[in-house]
């Protein structure tokens, strides 16, 4: 080795060792515009891209805790956990899939239910977690949904549910399909008693969830560009052998065709839900809006 190679080799090795390693997870990429984003900034922005306003998928527990007033949340039916009663096996055993999903998410199942206050108004809230087996609906989801609805009925308070699901959980076969009827039945009881149910459809809301509880709200809200439908657009195109309209099954298309009532930005969701709950329960708006301030002036 020549003297210059020795010097260059020493310099390059010392410079590479002095480079500080960037910890994993500090940066992430927008799933729409592919802009590289600082993860902490994205969290502060409620997982909405600050560059293109794309609403990314949002962790269920974080969503509910950010919706409710601080320190007001009480989890409902947290003890319920799915069981592999059918001993189901496809490429993997169902119990192994459950274990992997529980380890990945830190949750027992794909659905979280809570009681708390929203701008000091008591409410029951629930959310699907898409990261847990695609937010699929099984027996535990149905049981927790009913328990949450029963709490809303008992206290005569609004029930708000955020959907993010691929549909019924195939590993539970007919047990999962039964949850469509079970959740629809309790919502019929809520409607009969005049207890408000607000459904918020987020990306994606598909299959048995969209065909049951997700579209049965007294008011159906969607986040921008959420994919909403029964089968996905690719499956429909292959079935009907036709090209679907642009934006088909997206929230904006559904709003234009009267399938949902409104589209709300995530940053506005908390205040919008509070105003709707107040109107639907005949209570004063829990905070002053710009319109009220103008009226009082």
Swiss-Prot record:
Record-listed Zn(2+) binding positions: 30, 33, 49, 52
One BP term from GO: fatty acid biosynthetic process
Taxonomy, superkingdom: Bacteria
Coiled-coil regions listed: none
GO cellular component, one term: acetate CoA-transferase complex
Oligomeric and partner information: Acetyl-CoA carboxylase is a heterohexamer composed of biotin carboxyl carrier protein (AccB), biotin carboxylase (AccC) and two subunits each of ACCase subunit alpha (AccA) and ACCase subunit beta (AccD).
Protein name, entry field: Acetyl-coenzyme A carboxylase carboxyl transferase subunit beta
């Amino acid at each position: 080795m020549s003297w210059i190679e020795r010097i260059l080799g020493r310099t390059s090795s010392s410079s590479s060792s002095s480079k500080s390693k960037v910890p994993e997870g500090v940066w992430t990429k927008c799933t729409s515009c592919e802009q590289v984003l600082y993860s902490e900034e994205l969290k502060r922005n409620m997982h909405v891209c600050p560059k293109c306003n794309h609403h990314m998928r949002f962790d269920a527990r974080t969503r509910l805790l950010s919706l409710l007033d601080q320190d007001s949340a009480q989890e409902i039916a947290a003890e319920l956990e799915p069981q592999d009663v059918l001993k189901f096996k496809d490429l993997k055993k169902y119990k192994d899939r459950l274990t992997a999903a529980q380890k990945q998410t830190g949750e027992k199942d794909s659905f979280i239910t809570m009681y708390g206050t929203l701008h000091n108004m008591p409410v029951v809230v629930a959310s699907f977690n898409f990261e847990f087996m695609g937010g699929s609906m099984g027996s535990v989801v149905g049981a927790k949904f009913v328990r949450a609805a029963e709490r809303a009925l008992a206290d005569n308070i609004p029930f708000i549910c955020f959907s993010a699901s691929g549909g019924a959980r195939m590993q539970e076969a007919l047990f999962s399909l039964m949850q469509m009827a079970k959740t629809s039945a309790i919502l019929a009881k809520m409607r009969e008693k005049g207890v408000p149910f607000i459904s918020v459809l987020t990306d994606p809301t598909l299959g048995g969830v969209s065909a049951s509880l997700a579209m049965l709200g007294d008011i159906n809200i969607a986040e921008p560009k959420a994919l909403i439908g029964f089968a996905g657009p690719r499956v429909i195109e292959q079935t009907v052998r036709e090209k679907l309209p642009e934006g088909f099954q997206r929230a904006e298309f559904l709003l234009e065709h009267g399938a949902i009532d409104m589209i709300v930005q995530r940053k506005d969701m908390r205040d919008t839900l509070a105003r709707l709950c107040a109107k639907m329960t005949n209570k004063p708006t829990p905070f002053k809006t710009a319109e009220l301030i103008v009226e009082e002036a």
